[in-house]
From Swiss-Prot:
GO terms for cellular component: cytosolic large ribosomal subunit. Keywords: Ribonucleoprotein, Ribosomal protein. It comes from the Bacteria. GO terms for biological process: translation. The keyword Ribosomal protein applies. This is Large ribosomal subunit protein bL28. One of its GO terms (molecular function) is structural constituent of ribosome. Belongs to the bacterial ribosomal protein bL28 family.
Length: 78
């Protein structure tokens, strides 16, 4: 399963671990993803989405119906 937020599109980024001696080794910064069930009142069912914490805040702000219509317009099958 890919580590991508379906709402925001956040995906893993790359960077460096830097020690006190300034030695650098490559690492990945992973998004804070959660598999979360959202109740959709208009469809009278739960929808399970893999979203980041920022994605959850967007859903709280805009509403699940608006976010779902935007995702379906982008071509996501939900």
């Amino acid at each position: 399963m890919s580590k991508v937020c379906i709402v925001t599109g956040k995906r893993p980024a790359t960077g460096n671990n830097v020690s006190h001696a300034q030695n650098k080794t490559k690492r990945r910064f992973l998004p804070n993803l959660h598999a979360h069930r959202f109740w959709v009142e208009s469809e009278n069912r739960y929808i399970k989405l893999r979203v980041s914490s920022k994605g959850m805040r967007i859903i709280d702000k805009k509403g699940i119906d608006t976010v779902l219509s935007d995702l379906r317009a982008q071509g996501h099958k939900i």
